[in-house]
Amino acid sequence: MSDKTVYSRRNPAIDMLRALTMFTMIFVNDFWKVHDVPHWLEHAVYGEDFMGLADIVFPCFLFAVGMSIPYAIERRYAKGFSAESTLGHILSRTFALLVMGAFITNSEFRLSPEAPYPIGVYWFLMAIGFIGVWNQYPKPASGTQKNLFRAFKIIGVLVLLYLAFTFRNPQGGVFGAYWGILGSIGWTYLVCAVIYIFSRDRLQYLLPAWGAFILICLLGTPLREGFGGEAILAFPERNFYQGMLSILHIGNGALPAFTMGGVILSILSARYAGKGDGWKLRNGLTVAVLLLLVGIGTHHFWIVAKMGGTPPGVFYVTAISVGLYTLLSYLVSHQVTGWFNLIRPAGTATLTTYLVPYVFYGFADVTGVVLPDWFTHGFMGLVNCLCFAFVVIGVTWVMEKLHVKLKI
């Protein structure tokens, strides 16, 4: 087992990994408003044997989520919280991510002309609701302030209920259970965090759990056309096996494999925290190379794709995540961290950072602001998206100073 005191200290390299992935996510998510984006930056189309930068970011973020799990749970135990209380906290966080994911994903269908508000107003109200319910309010200095914060939460709930009941998509459909990215994070976090509660930092249990997710992915992902084009376990539809995976929200195992990989690396990092920097760098990069080689081997049998969570994609992205964390940890140990200040809010107020773009998009929709055409094509379009990502982080920083920060 690891020295539990390691988990009481914040790991800056995890914050950096989370910040880099969120910054990149904001950057690539803004591509919808520009044109002529290089293919290697974009999402691959379904069935394409390719992963662009946009395809790599989300799995890397899931890996970072996994790295945070041991620290978050061990800190709760160190503060005296019980396993039951910690499980309740995990369920609460999962519920928050599912709710936020549903509101964001439903809005991506846009709105029916009969809706009582345009999409921009929907996004404004959504942000107000999220902040009202999940803001990290300062400790109340008086009973009046405590009641005020409670009122803000109630207002937030009422705003979200109003949106849910009045939402209509362009086909007239009502608010649906579409979880989106945040929901996927929520379900994956739930699975891996519950496993950690039962296993703690005992790798003899966590490594088989990761191996099980990998095995599910290997057996359940369709092979290349040259090998038949079907999964090794090609059961008929509505079978018990797939039904159980669906109930547990494991899917084909790819998403929890990313997160459980992060959990394992986090434990190894804590366990060998006292080793020399050179030792950690060599071993971390060696593991990354081995994962890369396994990815190359599996690529012979499966295409590499984010959509469908293919085995080569799992191994490639895990290799990237391990290598990136190893390098970041090395930079931290050598105090090369000044650059991190530029994107720090994306690592310490990550959920707020993810919400801020919708406020900007809402403002653009309501006001009718349109970017000049020369700023939406090719290289200048990429500069546009890069500047937007930095502006989002700057706004998040200001919001933190004003005590506005989402905390679930």
Residue ranges of each PLM-predicted region?
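Alpha-helical transmembrane segments and their immediate juxtamembrane cytosolic regions
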Residues: 1-408
